[in-house]
């Protein structure tokens, strides 16, 4: 795949009502036209809140909108037939499809069980109370509406290591379940935040139970056969032992008919933690570049006071570009969400130019930046806020520019705190470009491109600058950009 470009084609507040799968089928041609060649679908299986579930409250991995469970047959995004039709339309347009894998926890159990638990200090999960409490917990998953179709596996308390609510006595908190697998405490090879960040929410899946790991491998084989997907996005891997995903990825790559694209979400702004995880899984997955996303957030808030020469310092794409999926926003960082770190709209064209037109990393585009989003929700202060996420003008042109002009050797001109630039040399087959941007006043860069680019007329593909720039016989010229803007200069004859 030339210049892979990923679209996250949903957001947290995408409307319910089964609209997404039909929308994707309808938009598939348009994705192809602008240069999107890979899409990340939201969790396609039934969540605990049924037709209202975003998908991260995972209930039944085998219900792709086919069974009357949790008050609905379709998921929030549509039914199984609509899902498969959307995937078919995307594939007809040579667009690879990634499925979202949420196997850290389950929610919405069908039955209670008598269980034994120990209280856990929420601020230091390594502190586990010695007292064992006899109680009941919602830990048994039988999926009665599915009635054993596709899988007869029954989840019970032996499949989980933790829970956040018990009954008889009724109590909320974090509790470690006592069973045959949890004697040593939490799983290892997870993030060390809060002492041990194995537990996140719901019924925490325990990967030390061999039957559980085999069931999740079986599900992967099943869902690949059902959907013919081309890869996976792995949710919340900082809470899942790295050894499990190394093993799981090895398995799915072995049984897949072709190599799968796999990217994991390890949300940490410490690049060392991301590199440690990559080492633990022996480089078998890419990771989203959370440090870079935070840099974009900070730069957009600071304006001209942000030193653009440092925009990639301490990021994964700088440290390990071959394992970095770069992004400007996602469903967790959008306003009013758990990891809220929005990038101001004025800066988004600059940020997208930096991930789409450079050679490093695989860029991910966020659905609302292409199509807009309007919603309201309650903030941390209890107040309700209306949110308007505008369409980012020229984003479709930047994506197209990636396919047409982001080729060849890259040279950086990061020599001014406000105005930076980079060039792509082009190849024998595809032309290159010069990208200039400023977070302050109007900017300019004098760039020597070499004799092969002598006496050429250049224009701004985005149309932000109206003048033409002509290189001298040695291929040197001064290229411009507006203040708080970006320009993509290309040879006029190739537009």
Curated annotation (Swiss-Prot):
GO terms for biological process: carbohydrate metabolic process. Pfam families: Alpha-amylase. Monomer. It is an enzyme of class 3 (hydrolase). Ca(2+) binds at residues 104, 198, 239. Its cofactor is Ca(2+). Disulfide bonds: none annotated. Gene3D superfamilies: 2.40.30.140, Glycosidases (3.20.20.80), Golgi alpha-mannosidase II (2.60.40.1180). GO terms for molecular function: alpha-amylase activity; calcium ion binding. One of its GO terms (cellular component) is cytoplasm. This is Cytoplasmic alpha-amylase. The gene is amyA. Belongs to the glycosyl hydrolase 13 family. Keywords: Calcium, Carbohydrate metabolism, Cytoplasm, Glycosidase, Hydrolase, Metal-binding, Sodium. Its EC number is 3.2.1.1. The record marks 332 as: Transition state stabilizer. It catalyses: Endohydrolysis of (1->4)-alpha-D-glucosidic linkages in polysaccharides containing three or more (1->4)-alpha-linked D-glucose units. SUPFAM superfamilies: (Trans)glycosidases, Glycosyl hydrolase domain. Its main location: cytoplasm.
